[in-house]
């Protein structure tokens, strides 16, 4: 173990470059899950939620960004049994239940891109009152309404 660490330090000294984190080595030449995940993110969130967000990711946040792109969007959102509209509704229901307004806002935009209507969003929030409680549902309503206003849909 110690020899590996010493070898890395020596390689860095020889090249004069700081070693790049192992998870960033070949991300541009990534596998099918990466490509599929990026395509889903682009379709749902546009360039700001795909390429720009990835390009702006720090080395510290890179493992999370890579994992979410491959596993969440590349492998889960692309499974054939549920379409993206249904997945958006399920995702939003879970985010309301967890009271995560930032993620609700992100996924409201994605839901609209996936064909969810504002009436369906309202119905989802109303339905969540029974299962999640009034405070969480109200937070979901407010967050969704703010996003709809920003998008010119409210």
Each predicted region: which residue ranges?
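Residues at alpha-helix boundaries and the short loops/turns that link adjacent helices
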Residues: 44-47, 101, 115, 131
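Acidic, glycine/proline-rich low-complexity segments that act as flexible tails and inter-domain linkers
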Residues: 2-85, 113, 139-154
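Mid-chain, well-packed structural core segment of small domains
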Residues: 92, 96-122
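Substrate/cofactor-recognition hotspot
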Residues: 134-138
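Residue-level detector of well-ordered alpha-helical segments, enriched
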Residues: 64, 85-89, 103, 120-124, ...
């Amino acid at each position: 173990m110690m020899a590996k660490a010493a070898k890395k330090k020596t390689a860095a000294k020889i090249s004069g470059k700081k070693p790049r984190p192992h998870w960033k080595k070949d991300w541009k030449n990534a596998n099918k899950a990466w490509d599929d995940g990026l395509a889903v993110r682009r379709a749902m969130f546009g360039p700001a939620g795909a390429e720009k967000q990835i390009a702006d990711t720090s080395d510290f946040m890179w493992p999370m960004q890579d994992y979410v792109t491959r596993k969440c969007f590349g492998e889960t959102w692309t499974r054939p049994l549920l379409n993206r509209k249904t997945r958006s509704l399920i995702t939003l229901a879970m985010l309301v239940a967890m009271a995560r307004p930032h993620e609700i806002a992100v996924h409201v935009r994605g839901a609209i891109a996936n064909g969810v209507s504002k009436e369906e969003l309202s119905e989802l929030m109303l339905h969540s009152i029974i299962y999640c409680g009034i405070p969480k549902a109200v937070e979901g309503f407010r967050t969704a309404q703010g996003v709809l206003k920003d998008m010119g849909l409210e």
